[in-house]
Amino acid sequence: SLHDALPIYDPHSYTNIVDCQNTQKRTLLPFWIWQEKSSEVYRLLEKYDNDEEQNQFVYFNLPLFSDQLPLCHCVITASCIEITPFGTDISKIKSFQSGSRRIFMSATLSDDSVFVTALGLKPESISSIITPESANDIGDRLILFPKHLNHNLTDEIIREKITQLAGQYNVVVIVPSGERAKFWDPTGSRTVTKENIKNAVSTMKERLVGLRVFVNRYDGIDLPGDACRMLVLDGLPPLHTEYEKYVQSIDASSSILLREQVQRIEQGMGRGVRSNSDSCCVVLMGDQLSDVLLRNQGVSYFSKATMVQFGLS
């Protein structure tokens, strides 16, 4: 079992994760151990796979990945075992595989190789991507990075000024965690949750509500016009998976993770500008976000239109 193999391969990780239950530690199981144990793992997954909401063990469609299991990554943490495939076997999705026409659309795709690696397109297909000749369908964004311009500015000073502006305009603050949300909204009265997000967005489109805080909402919300005249991105969008966190722990400058994080930042920046006649001020904050965009040259992964707006600002 994995329980027997891990302490032999990496006793320090075993101690940190299993014995000490350190939630900050994670380890990637070596591929030779994973391949040796994958059949045994599959039997366990098959045994405990169910749809019971209160007692769910497997959180993905097992038949979709069963053939790929020996080739997956396996990351072990104190709270979970995460199995990550290299990609989805789209041949098993019959409606997709047999479709006579497939249309792929993206507003912020900085790496089109994903069409080949994840969706199975032929390389020659991406040589004829349809793109607009100009960026005149994109609204106006003034992109500000206050601490990059003046190192003496503190988060508290920036917050005070933005809070003042929220008396005149609707201001949206997107933060990566509930803990950071407390910096902007200690009482929680202005923090939008999944329970009230629909009403909150609807109200912002109708009238002035001031400042609202959204936690980890970098896509899926549209705030055109006066619904959002100032958008604050405070902090770096969190990584999705334990595998991504593991990669970051051993290679903080990974170009793959950097590209994905910058794409999420750009998605967040687009929440307040929804048409070519729209306008919004975007404020970027946070030391980690600054490191990604400036020290690690993450700005180079912006789309061309956003890169131009960033440069002009």
Label for each model-derived stretch:
Residues 175-195:
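Conserved helicase motor "Helicase C" RecA-like lobe of SF1/SF2 P-loop NTPases
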Residues 1-169, 178-184, 311-313:
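Conserved coupling segment at the C-terminus of the helicase ATP-binding
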Residues 170, 179-180, 275-313:
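Long, largely alpha-helical accessory region at the distal end of helicase-like NTP-driven motors
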Residues 90, 96-100, 138, 165-170, ...:
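Short, well-ordered loop/turn elements at secondary-structure boundaries
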Residues 148-149, 203-292:
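Conserved RecA-like P-loop NTPase helicase motor core
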Residues 116-124, 187-191, 227-231, 245-250, ...:
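Short secondary-structure boundary/capping segments
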Residues 84, 105-107, 174-177, 194, ...:
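Short His-Asn-centered micro-motif
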Residues 77-93, 192-198, 202, 206, ...:
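Short linear interaction motifs
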